[in-house]
Amino acid sequence: MEHPLKTLWEKQSRLVIGFMSGTSADGVDAALVRITGFGTQTRAEQLGFRFVPFSDEVRAEILRLAGGGPASAADFCRMNFLLGELFCEAGEALCAQTGTKLSDID
């Protein structure tokens, strides 16, 4: 069985979603991008964009954890999983907005 990353690497065109949450901690940016080519011939075309704001509570907790004050490993683990869920929701919203099936994302 061929490794899934090798299969992805060999595709001429890949459909991906990039996620980011910056230092303002105001929400998640998600971009749907088609990547074609390889090496110096690589090209990226943005097909869609979505911003999903964090709730005031989530933003406050992110800033508290980033502030260097007292926090437990459990606090960071909870935030890690919550951010994963919020990034996933942003990706799902972006796919719905652009009419892209989740199964089409590489």
Where are these regions (language model features)?
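Short acidic/glycine-rich loops and adjacent helix/strand connectors
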Residues: 1-106
